[in-house]
Amino acid sequence: DIHTTAVAGVGVRKDVTRLTVSETENLREALRRIKADNGSDGFQSIASFHGSPPGCEHENHSVACCIHGMANFPQWHRLYVKQWEDALTAQGAKIGIPYWDWTTAFTELPALVTEEVDNPFHHGTIYNGEITTRAPRDKLFNDPEFGKESFFYRQVLLALEQTDYCDFEVQYEISHNAIHSWTGGQSPYGMSTLEYTAYDPLFLLHHSNVDRQFAIWQALQKFRGLPYNSANCAIQLLHQPMRPFSDADNVNPVTRTNSRARDVFNYDRLNYQYDDLNFHGLSISELNDVLERRKEKARIFAEFLLHGIGASADVTFDLCDSHDHCEFAGTFAILGGPLEHPWAFDRLFKYDVTDVFSKLHLRPDSEYHFNIHIVSVNGTELDSHLIRSPTVQFVPGVKDYYEK
């Protein structure tokens, strides 16, 4: 069942901006208790699921267990938020993990994580004694494309537009990366690092929202009459147990017995729900209309075949005409690091470059090239050849959606 009605209570995830004072204090007290718990359901143990210290292996090398760049990314993180949520509930939390809807334009991070006095959500302590910090980048608060809607809103709309699960997954995951990169910035112990991101409690709000976007896409798929609790791609991968949830020493029986990605498309099995599945005030049917209207206009996409580069990095790219007159074309982020599990997408990440083609008076069959700039989160410029130059696809507009 896809939930659309407003609800509240244990296992219900609310918009972080709608939390009551008592709900806020209840969550903070539960997190305080988790931080004081040195056992298998405590802060250090669950935070380590994602990154460092590495708990998984690949070709005889220790790697982080978190899954990125693969079709089971949504489900691994769906289970991970559930792991945190059940630990909070066991420590007295009366609601689920709230979500931070970063697709709505914002000028500051949620108060739940920024208030400094007696606030366990402000930062986390890492096993090595370091404290998580945040160094937000300017483009987190100011649209780098200067668009009519927020940068993140446009990126997620393109993800929600996809009707194939694996196409959706690529757009969805890369959109989520930018929040990691742009909230953590150059902090060596924070959201922009694969190894330490889960030690920052902001991670919980971010990934509650990321999972909600997955739930909204599933509701859209159901409305479209398309598969929403299964996929017709990456079949073998979606049948594989995901560690560390499948490990015998996982103390959470729900995540342990539902450790395959195919098991948790249907999140009713995990006993949580969202207060609603509206997107910017739109019902699922209204959202579908918005997505269909976007298809009426012809569009041009730069399409990247992405893979791991062993680092977290910001990517910007320019479009240049035959006279080397260049204009900023777009930006996205990669989440990775020395402990990453090797990954490579087999689907293209699409980026709408219609406006910049128009600005340079170019057509898809004109003479042009792209310049790619890759900067790691520590500020080091990386070799631009780490990412292959994108191909370009012209998608004709569909004019007859509303014609009777």
UniProtKB/Swiss-Prot annotation:
Disulfide bonds: 56-65, 166-233, 320-326
Residues reported to bind Cu cation B: 176, 180, 207
Cofactor comment: Binds 2 copper ions per heterodimer.
Glycosylation sites: 38, 60, 378
SUPFAM superfamilies for the chain: C-terminal domain of mollusc hemocyanin, Di-copper centre-containing domain
InterPro entries found in the cross-reference section: Di-copper_centre_dom_sf, Haemocyanin_beta-sandwich, Haemocyanin_C_sf, Tyrosinase/Hemocyanin, Tyrosinase_Cu-bd
Gene3D superfamilies noted in UniProt: Di-copper center containing domain from catechol oxidase, Haemocyanin C-terminal domain
Keywords for the protein's UniProt record, in alphabetical order: Copper, Disulfide bond, Glycoprotein, Metal-binding, Oxygen transport, Repeat, Thioether bond, Transport
Molecular function terms from GO: metal ion binding; oxidoreductase activity; oxygen carrier activity
Known cofactor(s): Cu(2+)
Top-rank taxon, per record: Eukaryota
Protein residues bound to Cu cation A: 50, 61, 77
Chain positions of cross-link 2'-(S-cysteinyl)-histidine (Cys-His): 66-68
Subunit structure: Decamers of large identical subunits (450 kDa), each containing 8 globular oxygen-binding functional units.
Family according to the record: Belongs to the tyrosinase family. Hemocyanin subfamily.
Physiological role: Hemocyanins are copper-containing oxygen carriers occurring freely dissolved in the hemolymph of many mollusks and arthropods.
Protein's name according to its UniProt entry: Hemocyanin, beta-C chain unit G
Organism, scientific name: Helix pomatia (Roman snail)
